[in-house]
Amino acid sequence: MKRDDFILMVGTAAVGILIAFAAVLFSAWPLSYAQDQLVSLRGAGSTFAAPLYKKWIEEYAVSHRGVTITYDPVGSGEGVKRFLDGSVDFAGSDEVLSGTELTNIPGALMLPITAGMITIAYNIPGVNSEIKLPRDVYVDIFIRRIHKWDDPRIASANPGIAFPHRDIALVVRQDSSGTTAALTKHLTTISPGWRAAGMDVGKFIEWPSAVLSAPGNEGVAARIRLSEGSIGYVEYWFAQRLALRMAALENKAGNFITPTAHAGELALSSRVAQVQELAASVVDPSGTDAYPLVSYSWMLAHAQYADQVKATVLREFANWSLSDRGQGYGAQLGYLPLSADVLSIGRQALVN
């Protein structure tokens, strides 16, 4: 088994989380299955949510037998590709399906399974404190308009910190990534300069020259840890696990916000209050104390499966992952629990 594969034996239910565009289709799924039946489920996709999938599978295995779940953290883009070509039963993605993708696979279902913060992590020799990054500054770092750590715009936002006169090494994803999609949506929303500089939005974009790249959130975090003078974007759990420094980012209200669970939850609540659809993105939350860079992570599944036992297993695990216990494991890992409104809609759709 590859180190990054999460393969565990689980039982009377297993993975899935579905709903979104047509919850009523779940009513076609059978309600139960024989406890002695063996079921195998395959998933792939998001590295953003991979630690939570791993934790869920491990914990579910404690009290369940008979179902094998595999989840391969290959990135959202590759996970969606495998889902579309039928090589996996479900996929994890930090980006909703495009119109073209939905056309290619009618009846695809999506549901936010968790949410998390995208941090801007850095490794600056001699700087051991939290730095503040104004909105226009971190946009221009990613555009490569700001090249040195002692740039006056960085220094003026951080009085008292002696920045070294050295190049900024930008670390980005080399694979097709929902984390990249969420970041670039945010950057183009907060700054017209993003598009004006010829930058794109999506899971895979052409970055300016002279950047460092790595696969997956884990790879980006490791590259930042090993590269002095570097900065990059990475999901909170990965930055925390490697003890990376994380910047306080200026939010829409003009406040500098450290990535904390409370600040992330405020960001999600500002969006849920406005939109009730489960495929909503949070690109620039308006809360006074909201952390500005957050993303849902979705699970993709089919409305109907030829194997009805497999369909039942997916639905049953979906209920478990939406439970207080399932969401609690996410909180333990630094993810943001889904709001009561989103959980209620999801659970009701599964009942229907």
Predicted segments, located by residue:
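Hydrophobic membrane-targeting alpha-helices
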Residues: 22, 26-30
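N-terminal hydrophobic targeting signals that begin at the initiator methionine
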Residues: 1-2
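Hydrophobic membrane-insertion alpha-helices, especially the h-region
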Residues: 12-23
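Flexible loop/hinge segments at secondary-structure junctions
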Residues: 5-12, 29-352
